[in-house]
Regions:
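Outer-membrane beta-barrel translocator/receptor signature
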Residues: 1-68, 73-83, 95, 140, ...
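Short, solvent-exposed loop/turn and secondary-structure capping segments
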Residues: 4, 66, 110, 244-246
């Protein structure tokens, strides 16, 4: 199933279909450094001469390769699980229906991104950041593929739906408060004296992506025009919805502590959002919405 459910484009990996011929189970276990534990198993069940199913599960647990020296958190770690159920129905000698569902879940500390002026350690796998990192991903895929040999051509119909839910907490300035002085970005507004990186974080940044696709293809079995023309006729439909939210915080009080709530009456934007950091109007929508909420709550 290409398109939405394929990774890459130049290289596509297609899983082996369930088989009605035999029962079999495969399993593997890998143990390595950084407390790596990787396990997977696949079992094929022939239900009848025309129906078969295959169930697969895999898990990976591994400590991170990188250490945050400020809070001791491991980064570049791994903690995920993948589950897949695959069914095939041989409707006739010339037609089949394949239905599968897949669930994938990630719950880890996240990827390491060292700040450009982070010189607290010469080891590239050691960094200093003052925000705890988190990454959570949940992906669900459901799809069906119908194939039929019509003699003169092969008919293929594909339908699928996919939902990806992503949540990330991260240190947005990539540095630890008052540890690193701005050297590499002279255009950065100096909020502190001396010019330290502003304490900033995303907590959280979320993305919900929902995609539905439908595809139909008719591919010739025999070339036309005396064997000179192979032809394909098809149509493709996709509906794609993305909902992103970013809750960003900056230490505007310059005291090394980020405030997660504005205590000023009616959340006056001139008090809570004094700086726009070079992007005029950056907080306009957020401040108006928050002002309305605070006014309603205190009335």
């Amino acid at each position: 199933l290409f398109g939405q459910n394929a990774t890459g484009g130049a290289i596509n990996v297609i899983s082996k279909m369930p088989s009605t011929s035999e029962f079999y189970t495969k399993a593997s276990l890998t143990i390595g450094d950084y407390s790596l534990k990787k396990a997977s198993t696949t079992t094929n069940f022939p239900i009848s001469d025309t129906v078969a199913t295959k169930f697969s599960i895999s898990t990976i647990e591994r400590d991170g390769f990188t250490e945050n020296l400020v809070n001791g958190q491991d980064l570049d770690d791994a903690s995920n699980i993948s589950i897949r159920s695959d069914w095939v129905f041989n409707l006739s000698e010339s037609s089949s229906l394949r239905v599968f569902g897949q669930f994938f879940d990630v719950d880890r500390n996240g990827a390491a991104m060292k700040g450009i002026d982070d010189f607290t350690s010469t080891n590239e796998r050691k960094l200093s950041q003052d925000t705890l990192s988190k990454q959570q991903i949940t992906s669900k895929v459901f799809a069906a593929i119908y194939e039929s040999d019509l003699g003169y051509a092969n008919l293929k119909i594909l339908a699928s739906t996919q939902e990806d839910d992503v949540l990330v907490d991260r240190d947005n300035d990539r540095h630890n408060y008052q540890d690193q002085i701005v050297q590499s970005i002279p255009q950065l507004p100096y909020i502190y004296t001396p010019p330290y990186y502003p304490m900033a974080e995303f907590r959280p940044e979320t993305s919900l992506v929902e995609t539905t696709t439908f595809e139909i293809n008719l591919v010739s079995n025999e070339p036309a025009l005396g064997g000179k023309l192979d032809w394909t006729v098809g149509a493709f439909f996709m509906e794609h919805e993305i909902e992103n939210h970013i809750r960003g915080y900056v230490d505007n009080d310059q005291n090394g502590v980020i405030r997660y709530e504005c205590s000023e009456a009616f959340a006056d934007p001139s008090y809570c959002y004094e700086h726009d950091y070079g992007i005029p109007g950056r907080f306009d929508v957020y401040s108006v919405s928050y002002t309305h909420l605070r006014a309603h709550e205190t009335s």
